[in-house]
Amino acid sequence: MQRTYEVMFIVRPDLTDEDLDKLVSTLETQVGTAGGTIKSVDKMGKRRLAYEVSTFTDGMYILFTIEGEGALIKEVERRLRVQEQVIKFITVRVDEEQKRLAKVKAIRDTKVRGKGTRAAEQAAAAEAAAPAAAPAEPASAEPAPAV
């Protein structure tokens, strides 16, 4: 079953642009020959790392959006693991995230609809109670006697 994955990896900051392009094209070729498709490649540039990784404080971020089988992703991760230029990587299955967000949105919409219905019912009850609470006799114009 084809699923969508995001693979983000960080490469050494001292890597040249040619070496980075070579690494990216190697991974693209590997994904293509394994039967997967690359939806997008986003080179996010050089950024500071949150903590030191392998004596590096900066890294160049690359984000792949891949559609393919789990075995393909396993092979991509294996290749990233053995590359000396790659200092960190993470893979996320996007379709699971989309399902979770859809579920949260459905729950939120249900709650909003429930609140809207409840508010409408309360307003209708208040309008119905308002005429009943009004006095039946008009107030007299004469002031009440002082005691």
From Swiss-Prot:
Record-stated family: Belongs to the bacterial ribosomal protein bS6 family.
Q: Which SUPFAM superfamilies does this chain map to?
A: Ribosomal protein S6
Q: Which InterPro entries match?
A: Ribosomal_bS6, Ribosomal_bS6_sf, Ribosomal_S6_plastid/chlpt, Transl_elong_EF1B/ribsomal_bS6
Q: Name one GO cellular component term.
A: ribonucleoprotein complex
UniProt lists compositionally biased (Low complexity) regions at 119-147
GO BP annotations listed: translation
Which top-level group of life is the source organism from? Bacteria
What's one GO MF term for it?
small ribosomal subunit rRNA binding
Tell me the classification of the organism that encodes this protein. Answer: Bacteria, Pseudomonadati, Acidobacteriota, Terriglobia, Terriglobales
- Classification via PANTHER family: MITOCHONDRIAL 28S RIBOSOMAL PROTEIN S6, SMALL RIBOSOMAL SUBUNIT PROTEIN BS6M
Which Gene3D superfamilies does UniProt cross-reference here?
3.30.70.60
What protein name applies here? Small ribosomal subunit protein bS6
Stated role: Binds together with bS18 to 16S ribosomal RNA.
Q: Where is this region: Disordered?
A: 114-147
Q: Determine if Cell membrane is one of this entry's keywords.
A: no
Keywords, A to Z, come to: Ribonucleoprotein, Ribosomal protein, RNA-binding, rRNA-binding
**One Pfam family hit:** Ribosomal_S6
Keyword Ribonucleoprotein present in the record's keywords: the answer is: yes
